Curated annotation (Swiss-Prot):
SUPFAM superfamilies: Lumazine synthase (SSF52121). This is 6,7-dimethyl-8-ribityllumazine synthase. Its EC number is 2.5.1.78. Pathway: Cofactor biosynthesis; riboflavin biosynthesis; riboflavin from 2-hydroxy-3-oxobutyl phosphate and 5-amino-6-(D-ribitylamino)uracil: step 1/2. It catalyses: (2S)-2-hydroxy-3-oxobutyl phosphate + 5-amino-6-(D-ribitylamino)uracil = 6,7-dimethyl-8-(1-D-ribityl)lumazine + phosphate + 2 H2O + H(+). GO terms for biological process: riboflavin biosynthetic process. GO terms for molecular function: 6,7-dimethyl-8-ribityllumazine synthase activity.
């Protein structure tokens, strides 16, 4: 599994007084409902673990729309998390959407200084998405990981603002 070697970021090691004060937005695509539901559940669980009881959640049609929504949200939030699923088909569309989402979200983060957690699954098969969605039987929980990374980065950056 590609998650081998990933850092272990434990939200409980962060100061709850810091994380609970952060304003968090989650923007989630709508394709591949079962996988997206798992990603969003994991993201909301991570927010709750960090003391953020009600993050703002915005739904968009697909992963291609994530960057523009994240850019708008970054104007009002301390951290943004983007969740989506792109599964390879028989055309180059997969590469175009994956690159646009990845580069767009990177641009949002770099240009605004707001951490954008990358929870976009780019999979060859639906099973790969299910394995990473945080569902019962999944090997990974990428929604939880994306929120954890965004909040840990936001706390770190606040030390230098």
């Amino acid at each position: 599994m590609s998650g081998h070697g990933a850092p272990e970021i434990d939200l409980t090691t962060l100061n709850p007084a810091e994380t609970s004060q952060l304003k968090l937005a989650i923007v989630a695509a709508s394709w591949h409902t079962q996988i997206m539901d798992g990603l969003l559940d994991g993201a909301l669980r991570a927010a709750k673990d960090a003391g953020i009881s009600e993050p703002t959640v915005l739904r968009v049609p697909g992963s291609f729309e994530l960057p523009v929504a994240a850019a708008r949200l970054a104007k009002h939030f301390d951290a943004v998390v983007a969740l989506g699923v792109v599964i390879r088909g028989g055309t180059p569309h997969f590469e175009y959407v994956c690159e646009a989402a990845t580069m767009g979200l990177t641009d949002v983060s770099v240009n605004t200084g707001v951490p954008v957690g990358f929870g976009v699954l780019t999979c060859d098969t639906e099973q790969q998405g299910l394995d990473r969605a945080g569902l019962p039987g999944s090997k990974e929980d990428k929604g939880h990981e994306a929120v954890t990374a965004a909040l840990a980065t936001a706390v770190t950056l606040k030390q230098y603002s």
